[in-house]
Amino acid sequence: MNNPTKSVTIEELKTDNGIFCRQTYTSTSQDCLVLVMGYGGSLRIWPATFVNRLAESFRVITYDNRGTGLSIIPQKPEEYTVKVMADDLFDVIDTLGINSHHLLGYSMGGCMALQYAHDHQDFVKSLFLLSSTAGGDLYAKPDRAISNALANPEGKTLWDIYMSTFSLMYAPEVLQRCMPTIEAIYEVSKECPTRPIALAGHSNAFRGFDGTSYLPGIKVPTTIVAGKNDRLMPVQNSMNIAENLSNSSLVLLDDCEHGPHIQNEDEIVDLIFKSAAKC
């Protein structure tokens, strides 16, 4: 798939509750697609190439989770829960006047997407869960060393910390291949890094999430995608969701890890287009 050649328009605003959001679209954008970033990530962590290619068909909505980017930064970890963060998403949707949209959640963002789909199912045309989990008894944990390294990234510089995290996501040879995208992400996000209090809050939110009881009631068409070699969110998590979500399809990617939209961008963009077209 070629890179988009259409002119991309970007509009930004902050809701009254302090959530910063962005709309990216082209002359051919139609339905809205909302992207929900995961642990510690602002909207700048979405690769521009990924967003711009999606904008050829969708009006793409991205936003800074609380504690990240230009959004509010609550100072107590207990002020961060998946429920509250899903409410932040609805604040964005309500502010933009959107009443129907596709929804994609990545990693911990998939937890927020599940919560949102449970709370506002009538708004969701289709759901994409990318490298995510339902939590609770369906959560398959990564190795403890991986979890500890994610929670405590090492490095003397911000770049070192970024690389510490991305090295958990990808094997060395994959990391090298994805380096141009990673460097681009760093350049657009380095001016507003996520603070330690927000990382503690996001950890609190993830630990407290249990969406297992939501799965039987979610009826929207759902595409579940995972890399078979994911070390951060073991593939069993996606398999567990698929087994308990009736209107779902499971796509497992060979030789893919915890960032299919970066490692396998062409395949993921094509999958989103095809899945959304069925709804």
Predicted features by range, described:
Residues 17-73:
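Conserved HGGG/HGGXW glycine-rich cap/lid loop of the alpha/beta-hydrolase fold
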Residues 253-269:
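Catalytic histidine-centered segment of alpha/beta-hydrolase-like enzymes
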Residues 218, 224-226, 230:
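Short beta-strand/loop motif that positions the catalytic acidic residue
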Residues 118, 125-155:
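Flexible "cap/lid" loop of the alpha/beta hydrolase fold
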Residues 138-139, 160-214:
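Conserved alpha/beta-hydrolase catalytic His-Asp/Glu region
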Residues 231-237:
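Conserved alpha/beta-hydrolase "acid-adjacent" motif
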Residues 105-109, 113:
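Gly/Ala-rich beta-loop-alpha elbow adjacent to hydrolase catalytic centers
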Residues 61-62, 67-104, 270:
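Active-site loop/oxyanion-hole signature of alpha/beta-hydrolase fold enzymes
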